[in-house]
């Protein structure tokens, strides 16, 4: 266990276990997704659903999608903040996979749709709620998933 003393109001920061990391990611709905292009980082909030070692999400076309298409290595940060001295944070490292509307990805695309639609307002960061699962040729909507390669987590509690 790693500790950090901060004066009269001590706080302990410790590494979370793999099981604790997975529990936080599973319970979460909002992440901060980071990608990079030509050495320039870019971070945005996303709504997501977690299943089978993937984060599933949805977006409109734009900088985030363009950058992930050119460099699929990404990370996402998910947290549970109770207070400045009581929080959990997990960083997920993974690989972007676009779920285009074509033969070979329909099952994964439909799975993303079904997982995301279980959560209220999942479409808000994507700007527009589709009525039916969107068709790539008729829409600028992009379903994607992040394959999780590894996770690290920290937890802070008041001592």
Regions found by a protein language model. Name each.
Residues 28-60, 76-77:
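Short beta-strand segments
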Residues 1-27:
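Extreme N-terminal tail/first-helix region
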Residues 2-5, 10, 85-159:
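Charged, gly/pro-rich active-site loop segments
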Residues 61-90, 97:
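Helix-adjacent hinge/juxtasegments
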Residues 36, 79-81, 130-134:
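Short, solvent-exposed loop/turn elements at beta->coil junctions and helix N-caps
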């Amino acid at each position: 266990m790693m500790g950090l003393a901060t004066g009269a109001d001590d706080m302990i920061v410790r590494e979370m276990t793999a099981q604790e990391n997975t529990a936080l990611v599973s319970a979460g709905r909002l992440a901060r997704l980071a990608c990079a292009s030509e050495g320039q980082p870019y971070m945005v909030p996303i709504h997501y659903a977690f299943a089978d070692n993937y984060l599933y999400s949805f977006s409109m076309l734009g900088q985030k999608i363009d950058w992930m298409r050119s460099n699929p290595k990404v990370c996402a940060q998910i947290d549970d903040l109770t207070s400045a001295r009581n929080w959990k944070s997990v960083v997920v490292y993974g690989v972007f996979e676009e779920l285009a509307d074509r033969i070979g990805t329909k099952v994964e695309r439909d799975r993303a749709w079904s997982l995301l639609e279980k959560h209220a307002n999942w479409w808000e960061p994507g700007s527009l709620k589709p009525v039916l699962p969107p068709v790539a040729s008729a829409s600028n909507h992009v379903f994607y998933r992040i394959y999780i390669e590894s996770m690290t987590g920290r937890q802070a509690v008041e001592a």
